């Protein structure tokens, strides 16, 4: 049951082959059995989930509901959920229960989905390995000694292990795509502004974007149907009608023009990962696509640009956590300054403190022009590279990450090695375009994701491309051994 698609489960719920309460209990039992090994959930909301499932059953009984009604999903723990702990993976918010619901979780709830709980993540979404969480590292279900990727590692691991049918994630520099690649699932980072950021705790406001994570492109499309669309509560929301993401999944790919950026296949890319990606591209050629080499000349500049812009925005966003209104407050402060200083020192982990310091430095007088302004100019060049390339081709393909999942603790002492894991994903966020990670095979027994990048608001096209690939391959149907034992 845990391996079945949203469409199949929705049909079973409609036919009364199973009730939402039974389905929810099945997933809660799997979480109880398997998650102690994975640590993919921070909060499991058992009672709330069963209440939602019972309400979904009543709705289905009357012949109403959507394709998500009664389907058990999980949410990354930076989406505010009214009445349910929302920690952002940080000690700073270890006791924060939001008084309101984020737009993303609200829309999925209105579609009738059941919330199993909140998934683990790198603290304030800062990390590429899910080792920066106050609640402990998440393990990769394919190999418990490996990282699941970050920062949405809990969501990716939970789906791969069959602890949730689908989940929400967020992507600031690859945080949906990289864990999706490492855990062998499908993930979509939408165009900036396509999915509301209201109630999504901010890391870097000009880069953050919520998106769906699931086993397949079709399941991601079901989630996008609920998530996408204009939201007046979010000033960065795109006032443009959302597409029907399910309507064109079966469109043929004949004549599709694929660009392969030479910069994505150079030094640093593991040769076994490259082989998997090229085999996937050949599959697209069989489906009627044509392939040409393109260039994104400023790719190498995406890391220095991103690691100035994102920490700068984070230092501003995270200044609100000072021990006054909400979040962690130190014991017995001597005065106001002592309370600010100690609350932040105690509440934030090392990586978050590091990025706040970098951002504050980059924005400080005398350095703003040298760092922040220059990084924004580079960002413009990167965006222009994509715009130019997407005039020649329909989509751009390449690897999501230079390697498969790496060992827990293997890169924590080398921040540059950790940051280089994001080399192929950061530029997409800087440009604001949509991109997906699609399971494409294995290297040394670990999953490899194919990255598919498209033009602004072309999510429906990306989902169509990924779905057609998944109709002719079965990489997305592979299940880790540990998941089969429950």
Swiss-Prot record:
Family matches, as PROSITE patterns: AMIDASES
Catalysed reaction equations from the record: L-glutamyl-tRNA(Gln) + L-glutamine + ATP + H2O = L-glutaminyl-tRNA(Gln) + L-glutamate + ADP + phosphate + H(+)
Active-site residues per Swiss-Prot or TrEMBL entry: 76 (charge relay system), 151 (charge relay system), 175 (acyl-ester intermediate)
GO biological process: translation
Primary enzyme class: ligase
Molecular function GO terms recorded: ATP binding; glutaminyl-tRNA synthase (glutamine-hydrolyzing) activity
Gene3D superfamilies according to UniProt: Amidase signature (AS) domain (3.90.1300.10)
NCBIfam families linked: gatA (TIGR00132)
Quaternary state and interactors: Heterotrimer of A, B and C subunits.
Function: Allows the formation of correctly charged Gln-tRNA(Gln) through the transamidation of misacylated Glu-tRNA(Gln) in organisms which lack glutaminyl-tRNA synthetase. The reaction takes place in the presence of glutamine and ATP through an activated gamma-phospho-Glu-tRNA(Gln).
Protein family per UniProt: Belongs to the amidase family. GatA subfamily.
Record-given protein name: Glutamyl-tRNA(Gln) amidotransferase subunit A
